[in-house]
Structures are given as C-alpha cells and as structure tokens.
Amino acid sequence: SFAKNKILRKVDLFLYPAKCILLSGKNGSGKTTLLKIVAGLEKPAEAEIEYSGKSLSWKKAIRNILKEIIYLHQQPLLFSGSVESNVAYGLRFTSLNRKQRRESVIKALEWSGLTDLANIQANTLSGGVQQRVAFTRAWILKPKVLLLDEPMSNMDHESREQARLLLCRMKSAGMSIVITSHVPQYFDGLTDVQFNLSNGQLAESEFSASNDSL
C-alpha cells in the first residue's frame, strides 16, 4: 500500500507479467504520483513491497527491483541526435559490445517500423513518432515493467494506433505495462484491468489474476 502527502491512501497495486493495467482519474487525482512511486522516483510515507512472494524493504526494492522498471514521461525525453542514437543510448550501460549493440538497435528499429527514420534528428519528428522512439528505446532494454504517463495525449488517431500496436507487442512478449490516461478508449484491446483513482483510492473493475504477480 502507498501513501503520499494524503494524495494516496492505502492503495494496493499488483503487477502481473504480460498484463496491462490502466489507471484513470481526473487531473490531480494522483495517477502520476502513483507511477513515480512504483518507479522509485518518489518515496512514499509508507510502503509494503512484495516481489516473487518475498517482502522487501524500500531500500532493497530500489537496489534490486527498480532496475527492471522503466518510466516514460508524458513528453518523450529525446536528445538532439538521430533516432538511431536515441534508441541506442541505454545500451551504453549494458555489458553488450559495440557489435552486439549495433545488432540490437537494427532489430529494434525494424520491430518498431522506424528503420527509414534511423538517421533523422529525433527531436524534429512529430510527437507521435517521438513517442514511438521512446517506446523503442525502452523496449531494447527489455524491462519487466513499463510505466507510461499519458502516453497518447498528444497523438492523432493514426499515431495512437501505431503506438498501441507496439504496446500490444510488448505485452505479448511478457512485459507488464501500467498506463495512466484520462481517455481509456485509447487503449481498447490492450487493457486487462482498469482502476479509477479518486479521493486517493483505487476502484477496481473485474480482473481474473490467473498469472503469478511479480
């Protein structure tokens, strides 16, 4: 459960492999705060964390679990380099050698349909394409959990469909995805369970948790 300056009160959130959770609610309801707590970017006043059946302290969770979680802001945080260099950035901190990194980037660009844009300056592209670049940069690192804060708020219909397809592929590969949005319809066909955050608490819709939680 989480609590943060009375924005969130006794919130329980369970993450499952290959499942997508949608968090809806009004602006200021605490959706982003909850995501940042899960990502380890904000520390709650109180928290109970269980991972693979074991209880962990906040310090151990930060050290052992959160490296498997990627949080993406509403606005894609891309630097002034090519699409390819943006996608490759995170691999610099892995054990892969230069050849392996190059091969991984080529496969990731093919996976996301961005091969033809590989040499284009990423920050000159439309918001929808920039978000796909951000998704690809996350995907190449193979996190267990992907946290997305209003990922489709600045996209047209075509861009949303392209982004939703990438998210479906991530989920099919076993990734756990948590999304905040005030427009749940954007994620039809992707979401497994939806929560509405109101007055600091989550109201859960029906969900059959057939898989083991993380």
What are these regions (language model features)?
Residues 39:
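Helix-to-loop junction immediately C-terminal to a conserved catalytic motif
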Residues 135:
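Hydrophobic anchor residue at the start of the ABC signature
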Residues 99-117:
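Conserved ABC ATPase "signature" region
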Residues 146-149:
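Catalytic Walker B motif of ABC-type/P-loop ATPase nucleotide-binding domains
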Residues 47-58, 65:
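Conserved ABC transporter NBD signature motif
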Residues 76-85:
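Conserved catalytic motifs of ABC-family nucleotide-binding domains
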Residues 121-125, 129:
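Conserved ABC ATPase signature
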